[in-house]
């Protein structure tokens, strides 16, 4: 059985970080659906917060691989993944 899982992904980037469009493409390619996006800009840092939906088995509680991949991307300073609900 597959279920819908909601989560909040927060990425803090410096000036050399990827563009929002590139992040969105990575999330879409990983089969995550973005429901909402917010941005906090503070000087040279930007924090994007994405409310996402992932379809997965209830037994599969691991963090999606794309989250780890984004965390290794140059210019991304911090990553937070938190299930919602």
Regions found by a protein language model. Give the residues of each.
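Conserved short beta-strand edge segments in small beta-sheet-based binding/regulatory domains
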Residues: 33-39, 67-85
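Canonical alpha-helical transmembrane segment with a positive-inside/aromatic-interface signature
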Residues: 1-39
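Helix N-cap motif at beta-to-alpha junctions
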Residues: 16-17, 55-60
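Non-transmembrane, membrane-adjacent beta-strand/coil modules in membrane-associated proteins
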Residues: 35-49
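Short, hydrophobic beta-strand segments
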Residues: 7-9, 46-54
